[in-house]
Each structure stands twice: as structure tokens, then as C-alpha cells.
Amino acid sequence: MKKINVVYNPAFNPISSKLNQTQLLKNASEELDIELKFFTSFDINTTKAKANLPFISNKILFMDKNIALARWLESNGFEVINSSIGINNADNKGLSHAIIAQYPFIKQIKTLLGPQNFDREWNPVMLDVFINQIKQSMEFPVIVKSVFGSFGDYVFLCLDEQKLRKTLMSFNQQAIVQKYITCSKGESVRVIVVNNKVIGALHTTNNSDFRSNLNKGAKAERFFLNKEQENLAVKISKVMQLFYCGIDFLFDQDRSLIFCEVNPNVQLTRSSMYLNTNLAIELLKAI
């Protein structure tokens, strides 16, 4: 019998979209006759030797973004899915776009990387310098995002310089600034990739918000990718070094897909609901 450890962050439990994630995995494991054992990140004591850790096998499905913990597990010989490198590549949105920029055939949103301000307030002079750089690089409206964030949080639409300045002044962490894709307002495509294979795609729309996150009230329906689009999603998962992920695309003016961001800890519950299938089955089968 295949045995897999699952490590998750209990801090996410109150979030409604994540409540059924463990149950989804349990249901899949029963169907596949796979033994799963669940651990929170707090259950792992990094002062202990490998032999004293409570794991049932060498494989760990790591449903957290704790890069240091993932790296520690890898250093002790565990196979961690996703790897610490993959999580790091995808969790930092600025780093994700820097990696994708190495591949010109992957169309992505025009993205300006903000300076690292080390959780300090903006120096007024440097804020002016950055705003001028933004204005020289793209026209309003623009999107300001924290390099870290999920569920559409810490994402702001700035219609003019006044809103941009106010938004940046409220940030105490690194941000990226992106051209606003007006033709894709409240609309995106989420593609789920497991082990270099597309296992599902959703078209999400939100009529009341520029963000198309399901957590922000968006609706979703199955989206059918053509072969070229499938290959694009798989290529992105490969260059990001991810075993499984959710890749978000926007629509360009010609309705082609343009890379937005990638989630290394994609939540399968709502996607499974809209696709009427348990996506965790494909994930566990692939491990």
C-alpha cells in the first residue's frame, strides 16, 4: 500500500474555501487505497533526528508555504511535494515574473518589480522616484500587488497617481506594479497542473469586483483548453519547478491567455466542486 504524509498549515482552517481540503484528500485516498497521515506544521520538531519523526513514509505532500521547513525536511532525505525551490519560485510573485521573463514565448503582464523596503515606511524621495518610474513604464490604471498574498488579498486597482501614492504608502512590504488588463476585468482562467499534466481548468468571472478570485465572490465554470494552451500551462509548471500548481491567466485583447501568477499550494476544494470531480485523486495517483 502506498503511504503518503500530508503536512498542512492549521492557521488556514478558518478560511471557508480550505475547510474541506483534508476531507477531499481522505476521500481520494480511500478510493485509491492509499494510506494518508496528516500533520500540522506544528507537529514537526526540527530539533529531532529523522528516525524520531512521526512520518509513515519518505513522501510528504507539503500543503504549506513554509519554505524553511520544506528545506529542512529535504535536508533530512524526505521527498517534499512541492519542493522548497518550487514553493519559493511561485510564492513570491516578483520572483515568479522574473523567472517567466526568461522565456519570451510565455506572454505575461507587463510587470515592474518594486524595491525591497524591509517593512519600513517609504522614504518620500524614493517614493517619488518609484512613482515616476511607474508612470514612465505604463499608463493608468495599474495594479499594485504585494509579492506575497493569496485569495486576491493585497491586490489594489489604482486609477490615477493619487490612488497609487496612497496605496504604496500603505504598503510596508515589497510590491509589484502591473499594467491593468482592462479587457479581462473580473475574468481569468485557473489551470491546475499535476506532474506535467493538466487535470482541470476553470473560467472564473466576477461582475462586482475587478478580481476574479472565487474567494472574492467570483463564479466559475469548466474551461476547455486547446493543446497549445495545455502545453503552455505545463511549460510554466516546469520552469517554476512545481509538481502541482494552479496557474492563473488573464485574457489579452485577442482572447489569448496571458500569464498572471502561479499558486504553489493550490486549493482543490472549490475547483473540484465546479468540475464535479475530486481533483485530489489525480494528485495522489501522481505521487
From Swiss-Prot:
Classification via PROSITE patterns: ATP_GRASP
Source organism phylogeny: Bacteria, Bacillati, Mycoplasmatota, Mycoplasmoidales, Mycoplasmoidaceae
Keyword Phosphoprotein: no
PANTHER family recorded: BETA-CITRYLGLUTAMATE SYNTHASE B-RELATED, RIBOSOMAL PROTEIN S6 MODIFICATION PROTEIN
Domain of life: Bacteria
Domain (ATP-grasp): residue spans on this chain: 115-287
Gene3D superfamilies: 3.40.50.20, ATP-grasp fold, A domain (3.30.1490.20), ATP-grasp fold, B domain (3.30.470.20)
Protein name: Uncharacterized protein MG012
